Amino acid sequence: MAEVQVLVLDGRGHLLGRLAAIVAKQVLLGRKVVVVRCEGINISGNFYRNKLKYLAFLRKRMNTNPSRGPYHFRAPSRIFWRTVRGMLPHKTKRGQAALDRLKVFDGIPPPYDKKKRMVVPAALKVVRLKPTRKFAYLGRLAHEVGWKYQAVTTTLEEKRKEKAKIHYRKKKQLMRLRKQAEKNVEKKIDKYTQVLKTHGLLV
């Protein structure tokens, strides 16, 4: 059986529920999905209201033994994971298998920093929300309800961006040199190019 291609999604700028619904559908269909930068996911509605909702959720617990659940995740990646779980039949084998195909991360850890990341236009805030509507960042909400690694994630992201900038600069330089090299030998290899074109080996 052919290996299933991994779909790497950049969570930044997407709406929580819409992205979760699309991800849930994809994992049920058998795709492996990785969502990075979960701290950049948006939630529609102003921040204060969303925080009140989450604080109300934190109060829901088992009176006699709170350690039995429900479990309240604080990290943005886990909050997103739980949202997707709510859209899956996770108590069945099929749902559990689908949930196992999902990976979520805060920031962009290796090896995903070197991979092409995609967006989902149907879930983007700029597409789905009116410009005047209020929204909140999942990272800020998580930080204010107990997530302890916002500063660490921000620092690591800044380092990653700096490395990516240097890599892109080098790549551009190499492309420029390659174009120049091709231009320099264009006249020398022209007769060979024509032969290859006549045989249909070069377009």
UniProtKB/Swiss-Prot annotation:
Q: Which residues carry this modification: N-acetylalanine?
A: A2
Reading the lineage from the top rank, the first entry is Eukaryota
Give residues where Phosphoserine occurs: S77
Residues the record lists as N6-acetyllysine modifications: K191
| Post-translational modification, as annotated | Phosphorylation at Ser-77 upon interferon-gamma treatment in macrophages involves a DAPK1-DAPK3 kinase cascade and is causing release from the ribosome, association with the GAIT complex and subsequent involvement in transcript-selective translation inhibition. Citrullinated by PADI4.
Q: Which GO terms describe its cellular component?
A: cytosolic large ribosomal subunit; GAIT complex
Carrying Citrulline, the residues are: R59, R140
Q: Name one Pfam family in it.
A: Ribosomal_L13
Name under which the protein is recorded: Large ribosomal subunit protein uL13
Q: What species was this sequence derived from?
A: Macaca fascicularis
Gene giving rise to this polypeptide: RPL13A
